[in-house]
Design a protein with these regions (language model features):
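Glycine-rich strand-loop-strand elements at beta-sheet edges
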Residues: 1-52, 143-166
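A generic short-segment signal for beta-strand/edge and adjacent turn/coil regions
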Residues: 18, 28, 128-136
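Acidic, glycine-rich loop-and-strand cores that form catalytic or ligand-binding grooves
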Residues: 53-134
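Short FAD-binding loop at a beta-strand-to-alpha-helix junction that anchors the flavin cofactor
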Residues: 138-142
Length: 170
C-alpha cells in the first residue's frame, strides 16, 4: 500500500481602499505559510491583516491537509481548505488543495495533491511517485502533498507566506 496526501490550501485575497492621514502608523501582520510535517497532517498558515482606524482587512490562512496513511484499496485524501477574506472592498478565497489518491492495480500507485494557488504565484506541485511534497512557489500558495510507500514516512511541502502591497495615491 501507499498514501497520497492532499495539498495544502492557498490563502485568501483582500483589497481595500482607505483614506489615511500622512505620518500615521498603521498596524499589519504578514501571515506565515503552513509547514509540512513528517508523518502527520500539515500545519495551517496564519492570516495576513492590515488595520486602518477601526477596520481590519484580513486575508485568512489556508489549512494544512490531513495525514495520509498507507492504503490497500482505492482511497482519496482531502486537500486543505483555501482561506477566505473579510472587510475588503474585494474579497477572494484561496484555492483548495487537491486530494491525493491511491489507485490499486497490480501494484498500488500513489499520487499526491497539489497545493492551492493564489493570485501571486504557483502552488507546490503534486507527485506521481513516492517522495516529500513540493514547496509552494508564490505568495499565499499551499505546498504539495507527500506520497508515501507502505512503510515510508514523508513530509508535505511548505506553503509560502502572505504579502501586503500598499499603493499610495495623492
Amino acid at each position: 500500500g501507499g498514501g497520497g496526501g492532499g495539498g495544502g490550501g492557498g490563502g485568501g485575497y483582500a483589497e481595500k481602499t482607505f483614506a489615511v492621514t500622512p505620518s500615521t502608523n498603521y498596524g499589519y501582520v504578514i501571515g506565515t505559510g503552513g509547514t509540512g510535517v513528517s508523518g502527520a497532517g500539515g500545519n495551517n498558515g496564519t492570516s495576513s491583516t492590515f488595520t486602518v482606524g477601526g477596520v481590519t482587512v484580513s486575508a485568512l490562512f489556508g489549512s494544512g491537509a490531513p495525514v495520509a496513511t498507507a492504503a490497500t484499496t482505492l482511497t482519496a485524501r482531502a486537500g486543505g481548505v483555501g482561506g477566505l477574506s473579510t472587510s475588503g472592498d474585494m474579497n477572494g478565497a484561496g484555492e483548495n488543495g487537491t486530494p491525493g489518491v491511491v489507485l490499486i492495480v497490480a501494484t498500488p500507485i500513489v499520487c499526491s495533491g497539489k497545493g492551492g494557488s493564489s493570485l501571486y504565484g504557483r502552488e507546490g506541485a503534486g507527485l506521481v511517485a513516492v517522495g516529500n511534497g513540493n514547496a509552494a512557489l508564490g505568495y499565499g500558495t499551499g505546498g504539495g502533498g507527500a506520497a508515501t510507500g507502505a512503510s515510508t514516512v514523508r513530509t508535505g511541502g511548505n506553503g509560502m507566506p502572505g504579502i501586503i502591497i500598499v499603493d499610495e495615491y495623492a
